Amino acid sequence: MAKADFYETLGVAKSADEKELKSAFRKLAMKYHPDKNPDDKDAERKFKEINEAYEMLKDPQKRAAYDRYGHAAFEHGGMGGGGGGFAGGGFSDIFEDIFGEMMGGGRARQRSSGGRERGADLRYNMEITLEESFSGKTAQIRVPTSITCDVCSGSGAKPGTQPKNCGTCQGTGRVRAAQGFFSIERTCPTCHGRGQIIPDPCPKCHGQGRVTEERSLSVNIPAGIEDGTRIRLQGEGEAGARGGPAGDLYIFLSVKPHEFYQRDGADLYCAVPISMTTAALGGTFDVATLDGTKSRVTVPEGTQVGKQFRLKGKGMPVLRSVQTGDLYIQIQIETPQKLTKRQRELLQEFEQLSSKENNPESTGFFARMKEFFEG
């Protein structure tokens, strides 16, 4: 069966540049990746074709040879026998090249000599109250993670034995092989890039050097921390494989909405409803603040809806600072409901006694509107 044209496989023109090739490959690889299409042989075949096409076209020399000779340029002395295919670990190498940054830097970059691998970073979501954000706290959390195996001390080898250098790659984790007119390097298919093999695996961790366990950790939440803040606990992530360094644990904080207060940076806002008569005649009321005290607010007569009163220093603490924000009281005026007959009579009498000076805003507004429409 004749091979499909590499350009057609990727859905690009022969004049496509490197950026267009990479973009086309990324979209197709994500669509047909085996993890998204388990047990789908057609998707697996398509994924291999996509990888093969991109491997050839991304290299200027290989692309030039293909443009000139077609598939014939790679049909002699290719890997895996006759067809110049991608036997062994080639697909993962290409996939890491494109998606390395998306997948934490790629496996090859996570490994060091001796097959050691850095552990994965972990994420833990924590929700706290506004009061806890105000005062700070120390929280105890339990995190399921991988820790270093205590039987083999992370080596992955059965006690009394040691890992050995891979005979295929001589401990380098990479092998070179001829493909057509070219010689390319790829991950060793025997040790999968680790450079070592474990003849006698540890009975507890089965050669991984780590086991799954739930750990208890203490997390310090500083006063003033905001919603969406990320706290990094270095070395508290997943244990590294075969003695590699541990990853980090990231605590992602969210602050619960408060019943009375809304936060904006270090400032707090509280909407307080007062009666119509209090707004007209003036008065006082107390508000509870997050520091556990009460503050008295004096409302002058004639206070309008939306009026703000500032309580200096009654807001949130500024993170890692001695400064604090302010608390703003926003006045809302409540219109009375379910009036008695006598209350209605008094309000009607009040309305009759009112003058333009009592309601300058509404009087002025309707006067301007009348002038606007009548000219």
Swiss-Prot record:
Zn(2+) 2 binds at C166, C169, C188, C191. Gene3D superfamilies: DnaJ domain, Heat shock protein DnaJ, cysteine-rich domain, Urease metallochaperone UreE, N-terminal domain. A zinc finger (CR-type) spans 136-214. It holds the Pfam family DnaJ_CXXCXGXG. GO terms for cellular component: cytoplasm. It comes from the Bacteria. Its cofactor is Zn(2+). Transmembrane segments: none annotated. Residues 5-70 form the J domain. It is found in: Cytoplasm. Binds 2 Zn(2+) ions per monomer. Its main location: cytoplasm. GO terms for molecular function: ATP binding; heat shock protein binding; unfolded protein binding; zinc ion binding. One of its GO terms (biological process) is protein refolding. Zn(2+) 1 binds at C149, C152, C202, C205. CXXCXGXG motif repeats lie at residues 149-156, 166-173, 188-195, 202-209. Keywords: Chaperone, Cytoplasm, DNA replication, Metal-binding, Repeat, Stress response, Zinc, Zinc-finger. InterPro entries: DnaJ, DnaJ_C, DnaJ_domain, DnaJ_domain_CS, HSP40/DnaJ_pept-bd, HSP_DnaJ_Cys-rich_dom, HSP_DnaJ_Cys-rich_dom_sf, J_dom_sf. The J domain is necessary and sufficient to stimulate DnaK ATPase activity. Zinc center 1 plays an important role in the autonomous, DnaK-independent chaperone activity of DnaJ. Zinc center 2 is essential for interaction with DnaK and for DnaJ activity. Belongs to the DnaJ family. Homodimer. Participates actively in the response to hyperosmotic and heat shock by preventing the aggregation of stress-denatured proteins and by disaggregating proteins, also in an autonomous, DnaK-independent fashion. Unfolded proteins bind initially to DnaJ; upon interaction with the DnaJ-bound protein, DnaK hydrolyzes its bound ATP, resulting in the formation of a stable complex. GrpE releases ADP from DnaK; ATP binding to DnaK triggers the release of the substrate protein, thus completing the reaction cycle. This is Chaperone protein DnaJ. It comes from Rhizobium johnstonii (strain DSM 114642 / LMG 32736 / 3841).
